[in-house]
């Protein structure tokens, strides 16, 4: 049995539809309170997006589907074996209130709210800008509105949530998409089974 870690939420739906469309599974993976789902030869572990790579690195899962944003924030000792460029598409951006756009172009020091601490620090260090990072685990759009931060670093898919909260994109950091990652030991001992999946998904 091949153990596959997949994230809860939006990516679960996309991955389920992808596997179904490629005849890898006979029915969709339904999101429910059940966190381990066995379908044919696969055991799906439904976990938090930020935990997928940990499950794979530690060998609890053989392979996993994870966003590039997660891998950049917290690199792991795993193999990245396939890009799913049309799955989990989003962008990592710096966003803030429109009136801050002029200030953004002449930054020397700023407060940034984000859950992507390492990405934010690396990005602004590359610009030689000193920042005070305020780590938040959700609803980061609130931070600039109430004056907790000057800007946020977060992922956006359509920009709708930013717009609804009166924020605009100041700068794109990178585009993100899903990747299939693999445990290093599993890659050796389950190589045949893993490559059967890759063959079916390689045109994505």
Swiss-Prot record:
GO function terms (MF aspect): ATP binding; ATP phosphoribosyltransferase activity
Enzyme kind, highest EC tier: transferase
GO biological process: L-histidine biosynthetic process
Pathway linked to the protein: Amino-acid biosynthesis; L-histidine biosynthesis; L-histidine from 5-phospho-alpha-D-ribose 1-diphosphate: step 1/9
Reaction(s) catalysed by this chain's protein: 1-(5-phospho-beta-D-ribosyl)-ATP + diphosphate = 5-phospho-alpha-D-ribose 1-diphosphate + ATP
First-listed, main subcellular location of the protein, grouped into a coarse class: cytoplasm
InterPro entries (UniProt xref): ATP_PRibTrfase_cat, ATP_PRibTrfase_CS, ATP_PRibTrfase_HisG, ATP_PRibTrfase_HisG_short
Record's keyword terms, sorted: Amino-acid biosynthesis, ATP-binding, Cytoplasm, Glycosyltransferase, Histidine biosynthesis, Nucleotide-binding, Transferase
A Gene Ontology cellular-component term: cytoplasm
CDD domains per UniProt: PBP2_HisGs (cd13595)
Subcellular localization, as worded in the UniProt entry: Cytoplasm
EC number: 2.4.2.17
Comment field on protein domains: Lacks the C-terminal regulatory region which is replaced by HisZ.
PANTHER family membership: ATP PHOSPHORIBOSYLTRANSFERASE, ATP PHOSPHORIBOSYLTRANSFERASE ATP-PRTASE
Family per similarity comment: Belongs to the ATP phosphoribosyltransferase family. Short subfamily.
Subunit structure: Heteromultimer composed of HisG and HisZ subunits.
Function noted in UniProt: Catalyzes the condensation of ATP and 5-phosphoribose 1-diphosphate to form N'-(5'-phosphoribosyl)-ATP (PR-ATP). Has a crucial role in the pathway because the rate of histidine biosynthesis seems to be controlled primarily by regulation of HisG enzymatic activity.
Listed name of the protein: ATP phosphoribosyltransferase
Source species: Hydrogenobaculum sp. (strain Y04AAS1)
């Amino acid at each position: 049995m091949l153990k596959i870690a997949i994230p809860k939420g939006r990516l679960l739906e996309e991955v389920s539809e992808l596997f179904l469309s490629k005849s890898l599974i006979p029915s969709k993976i339904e999101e429910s309170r059940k966190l381990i789902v066995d379908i044919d030869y696969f055991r799906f572990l439904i976990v938090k997006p930020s935990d997928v790579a940990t499950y794979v690195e530690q060998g609890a899962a053989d392979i996993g589907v994870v966003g590039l944003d997660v891998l950049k924030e917290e690199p792991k000792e795993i193999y990245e074996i396939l890009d799913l460029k049309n799955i989990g598409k989003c962008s990592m951006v710096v966003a803030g209130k429109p009136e801050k756009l002029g200030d953004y172009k002449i930054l020397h020091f700023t407060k940034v709210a984000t859950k992507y601490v390492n990405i934010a620090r690396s990005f602004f260090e590359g610009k030689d800008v000193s920042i005070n990072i305020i780590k938040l685990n959700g609803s980061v759009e609130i931070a600039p509105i109430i004056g907790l931060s000057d800007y946020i670093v977060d992922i956006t898919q359509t920009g709708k949530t930013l717009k609804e909260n009166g924020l605009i994109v100041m700068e794109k950091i990178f585009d993100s998409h899903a990747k299939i990652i693999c445990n290093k030991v599993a890659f050796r001992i389950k190589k045949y089974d893993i490559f059967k999946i890759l063959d079916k998904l390689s045109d994505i």
